[in-house]
Design a protein with these regions (language model features):
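ABC ATPase NBD coupling module
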Residues: 11-29, 47, 55
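A short, proline-enriched helix->beta-strand linker immediately N-terminal to the Walker B motif
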Residues: 106-110
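Conserved ABC ATPase signature
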Residues: 86-91, 95
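Hydrophobic anchor residue at the start of the ABC signature
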Residues: 101, 129
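Short, glycine/charged-rich "phosphate-handling" switch motifs in NTP-dependent
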Residues: 160
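Conserved ABC ATPase "signature" region
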Residues: 62-82
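A short, surface-exposed alpha-helical micro-motif characterized by mixed small hydrophobic
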Residues: 154-156
Length: 167
């Protein structure tokens, strides 16, 4: 496939993922389908959330931990200070997906691309994750590109639904 990426009216020509401009990375964040594969098992939750903040120079060392605790609690992982110290293997799939959502929110993006974020979760957890997306859309004035095969989830969350033929 081919195409162009425009952000605020500017063409963001990208040939490789490492060439993606920092402005784009801050403005557009991803939440991936697999909560088990999107977090590195050797790092704590704190590391996963702190890394983008350090990279974009958004928080200093003293601001970092309280902000991460706040993010974790915002996505329903309480107490946040306990979750910040956990490793991915110590959490359920739903908890891991909440960490991925918190990481995406950490940079205060304008757009989140969520690629099948509920497909690998238990049915009992899916609604909780959809509620988090709905809440953050309203609270953060956020655009969510929610990619799914589940039309009921799309109908619940979306203002507009686009169905791709052979996509």
């Amino acid at each position: 496939s081919a195409g162009s990426i425009y952000l605020n009216g500017k063409n963001k020509k990208v040939t490789e993922s490492r060439n993606v401009p920092l402005e784009y990375r801050k403005t557009v964040q991803m939440v991936f389908q697999d909560p088990f594969g999107s977090l590195n098992s050797i790092h704590t939750v704190y590391h996963h959330l702190a890394r983008p903040l350090f990279r974009h120079k958004l928080k200093n060392q003293t601001e970092m931990f309280p902000y991460i605790v706040h993010l974790l609690e915002k996505v329903g992982l309480t107490p946040g200070d306990k979750f910040a110290k956990k490793f991915p293997h110590e959490m359920s799939g739903g908890e891991r997906q909440r960490v991925a959502i918190a990481r995406a929110l950490s940079l205060d993006p304008k757009i989140i691309v969520a690629d099948e974020p509920t497909s690998m979760l238990d049915v009992s957890i899916r609604m909780d994750v959809l509620e988090i997306f709905a809440k953050m859309r309203k609270e953060n004035n956020l655009t969510v590109l929610f990619i799914t095969h589940d039309l009921a989830s799309a109908r619940y969350l979306a203002d507009r639904i686009i169905v791709l033929k052979n996509g």
